[in-house]
């Protein structure tokens, strides 16, 4: 037989009010088990959907918003034990973390696939141009592929001092990391890099930041 909390005995009206605020379909343990199964099934469907390239942060955020009421209910429901409440919370949090890890890894895979596509474009261009010179794949973008032949130069690794200057500028302008013409001229003058190389480096840096970004809603529920 389940014990009735002393607080409920001393405050029956408050106890009734608390129960009435809980949806009727959440009031017994069998319903809790059904809800737990729904949580697991929903996250599994989301996981496989993301594997099929249907992934974005908006879907994850929407999923979190849908399950936030369940977390609130589980914390307040007196018919659940502490262990059951912790179990339901852990399922949701660990599932969200799994989705975020998958999203991050898929971002890395997209970068690899992007590089492979660029290599294929270069090989195709090389076959059609006798005067083609090798370029640095890491800083090559689609803009360079459409440039004139005389703009292609043999690529070299950026010097550490050049990278440091670019990183410093990016850190100071992270909220709006897009170069004004005077900034572009300054960096080009002090690094001997071409304007195209600088723009390409910043484009890659922005892409890297975007992949690792986690929305505030997701951070809040995981903390």
Curated annotation (Swiss-Prot):
Keywords attached to this entry: DNA-binding, Homeobox, Nucleus, Repressor, Transcription, Transcription regulation
In Gene Ontology terms, what is a biological process of this protein? regulation of DNA-templated transcription
Gene3D superfamilies reported in the protein's UniProt record: Homeodomain-like (1.10.10.60)
PROSITE patterns documented for this protein: HOMEOBOX_2
Q: Where in the cell is it found?
A: Nucleus
GO CC terms on record? Answer: nucleus
The record's DNA-binding region positions are: 151-213
Q: InterPro entries attached here?
A: HD, Homeodomain-like_sf, KN_HD
Primary residence: nucleus
Presence of the UniProt keyword Nuclease in the record? no
Q: What are the recorded GO MF terms, alphabetically?
A: DNA binding
Q: What is its quaternary makeup?
A: Forms a heterodimer with A1.
What more does the entry say? There are three genetic loci for mating type genes in K.lactis. MAT is the expression locus that determines the mating type of the cell, whereas HML (containing HMLALPHA1, HMLALPHA2 and HMLALPHA3) and HMR (containing HMRA1 and HMRA2) represent silenced repositories of mating type information. The mating type is determined by the MAT locus, which contains either a copy of HML or of HMR. Diploid cells are usually heterozygous for the MAT locus.
Family membership: Belongs to the TALE/M-ATYP homeobox family.
What is the protein's known function? Mating type proteins are sequence specific DNA-binding proteins that act as master switches in yeast differentiation by controlling gene expression in a cell type-specific fashion. Transcriptional corepressor that acts in conjunction with A1 to repress transcription of haploid-specific genes.
Q: What is this protein called?
A: Mating-type protein ALPHA2
